[in-house]
Amino acid sequence: MPDYRSKTSTQGRNMAGARALWRATGMKDEDFKKPIIAIANSFTQFVPGHVHLKDLGQLVAREIERAGGVAKEFNTIAVDDGIAMGHDGMLYSLPSREIIADAVEYMVNAHCADAIVCISNCDKITPGMLMAALRLNIPVIFVSGGPMEAGKTKLASHGLDLVDAMVIAADSSASDEKVAEYERSACPTCGSCSGMFTANSMNCLTEALGLALPGNGSTLATHADREQLFLTAGRTIVELCKRYYGENDDSVLPRSIANFKAFENAMMLDIAMGGSTNTILHLLAAAQEGEVAFDLRDIDRLSRKVPQLCKVAPNIQKYHMEDVHRAGGIFSILGSLARGGLLHTDLPTVHSRSMEEAIAKWDITQTDDEAVHTFFKAGPAGIPTQTAFSQSTRWETLDDDRENGCIRSFEHAYSQEGGLAVLYGNIALDGCVVKTAGVDESIHVFEGNAKIFESQDSAVRGILADEVKAGDIVIIRYEGPKGGPGMQEMLYPTSYLKSKGLGKACALLTDGRFSGGTSGLSIGHASPEAAAGGAIGLVRDGDKVLIDIPNRSINLQVSDEELAARRVEQDKKGWKPAEVRPRKVTTALKAYALLATSADKGAVRNKAMLEGL
């Protein structure tokens, strides 16, 4: 029977000093025999997805204590990618993922905590905490802050989100008054941005991995139903502790739950719902932390057989996360995958003995449980607020239309090709990724002339100055994990291409990455990156590039001999941008770049460089 990790600091005469300090935090004699459960919160007033989390850690703490545990809360950092976007602040976004993972490890191991409740929400916070959970391999449960309500305005017939505000701002035909109206309406409440962007994608994937409760990814941040997720998480983590430490049941550990098959389930969900390409980066990183042999080739294999069963903004304007919830949430998509014979349903979760059991209970098309149906009727109130659980609006009906609704059956899929694809070719030998859910079918095969930019900043200037023409393939390089450093998101370039009417007339390829809000023929994560000697660094203005999504290929139309000659020349010059970039790279960013791998490895640290230390 495994001992509580916390015994290291709570038991024995020699630990009198440590116990004295524990007592100073409020612990009593009887508490030293209970599991100490860390609550990793991520409250900050910088991020709308986290602004409402301040008191939620203590909400969970009280529930843990009622269930027989001791709760100790700490906080991690959280970067808002939307606010950091378009300037050097974005250099810090992806590196913050590693900082968050390390912070959770530091706090949990330094204080010998027995289990963790991860209160996450936005883009790098959920991945960072997931990496830490799999690294530590002690009982864990995830509960996120929830998605934002979609914005509403009389100037648009559809719900609004952050991307709408960005696109309209760059549209020279839009009046200042219209831009101001979109700005004020796009992000009305607390919560993670309302589309299937990176934050919501990752929170949905924690359900598929089996590490979060049903509804975690789709229940609105403002809705009263979300409070029950936090309370249930508090009770559940104590039960997981009892099963592991009291019954020697290691099936409750994160590496037992989030195994190879679970990663396949998560990736199949991602492909089926057209999630953010960033999820690929984060799943690969989490798999490495959990020592799961899941890589880009597995994602490529799955992308060829999973259809697109759900379409949400930014891939379609009609639906946002509140609509996914009304259609039954993630377990309804998982149910469709299961009935299609793709999902691994024999896996345990933190809340059910198997995924099959969970689907039977939570898929609205499979259950007659009125409580479940009521749960998925939770909807938006349309009242601007920064307060969690502040409304209890419900839809009158569910969206259980699997032929024409938000979530589809296999027979009525949006497309038989899934929403994400991996492309290989001489310009990206180790692969690159594209969100096919956001690409118009008319440009699934696209040949164009390369238009080279050595940074995101110069690309933005070029697009706004009309230097990019229809038929161009915009190449933005030296923006990978090492080259940026930090692998910036390219939401502004793609948004500006849209505003210039080039969304279906151009492509964009980068060794950087894209926001979950990106759509269009936007191909990222080109590996190896330019700074690591990748062929994207050998492309020249005017070179022909052929993109062929159906055949999963992307190739520079240049001979092998010419590429070899260019490589010799570039080796002499050094793999760095051809222009000086006015970019302040701090010591912290240099340290990140020193160990960073390319995107095909999840942009994690190169552990080989640390061997022997």
Swiss-Prot record:
Instruction: Provide the residue positions that the database annotates as binding Mg(2+).
Output: 81, 123-124, 489
Q: Does the keyword Iron-sulfur apply?
A: yes
Cofactor remark from the record: Binds 1 [2Fe-2S] cluster per subunit. This cluster acts as a Lewis acid cofactor.
EC number(s) on file: 4.2.1.9
Annotated Gene Ontology cellular components are: cytosol
BP GO terms, sorted:
isoleucine biosynthetic process; L-valine biosynthetic process
UniProt-recorded Gene Ontology molecular function terms: 2 iron, 2 sulfur cluster binding; dihydroxy-acid dehydratase activity; magnesium ion binding
The protein's annotated catalytic reaction(s) are: (2R)-2,3-dihydroxy-3-methylbutanoate = 3-methyl-2-oxobutanoate + H2O; (2R,3R)-2,3-dihydroxy-3-methylpentanoate = (S)-3-methyl-2-oxopentanoate + H2O
Give residues where N6-carboxylysine occurs.
124
Any idea which residues are catalytic in this one? 515 (proton acceptor)
For this UniProt record, the keywords arranged alphabetically read as follows:
2Fe-2S, Amino-acid biosynthesis, Branched-chain amino acid biosynthesis, Iron, Iron-sulfur, Lyase, Magnesium, Metal-binding
Q: Where does [2Fe-2S] cluster bind?
A: 122, 193
Q: In which pathway does it act?
A: Amino-acid biosynthesis; L-isoleucine biosynthesis; L-isoleucine from 2-oxobutanoate: step 3/4; Amino-acid biosynthesis; L-valine biosynthesis; L-valine from pyruvate: step 3/4
Q: Per its UniProt entry, what is the enzyme's top EC class, as one word?
A: lyase
Cofactor(s) this protein requires: [2Fe-2S] cluster; Mg(2+)
Family of the protein in this entry: Belongs to the IlvD/Edd family.
Annotated NCBIfam families: ilvD (TIGR00110), PRK12448.1 (NF009103)
Q: What does this protein do?
A: Functions in the biosynthesis of branched-chain amino acids. Catalyzes the dehydration of (2R,3R)-2,3-dihydroxy-3-methylpentanoate (2,3-dihydroxy-3-methylvalerate) into 2-oxo-3-methylpentanoate (2-oxo-3-methylvalerate) and of (2R)-2,3-dihydroxy-3-methylbutanoate (2,3-dihydroxyisovalerate) into 2-oxo-3-methylbutanoate (2-oxoisovalerate), the penultimate precursor to L-isoleucine and L-valine, respectively.
- What is its quaternary makeup? Homodimer.
Name recorded for this polypeptide: Dihydroxy-acid dehydratase
* Organism per entry: Pseudomonas putida (strain W619)
Phylogenetic lineage: Bacteria, Pseudomonadati, Pseudomonadota, Gammaproteobacteria, Pseudomonadales
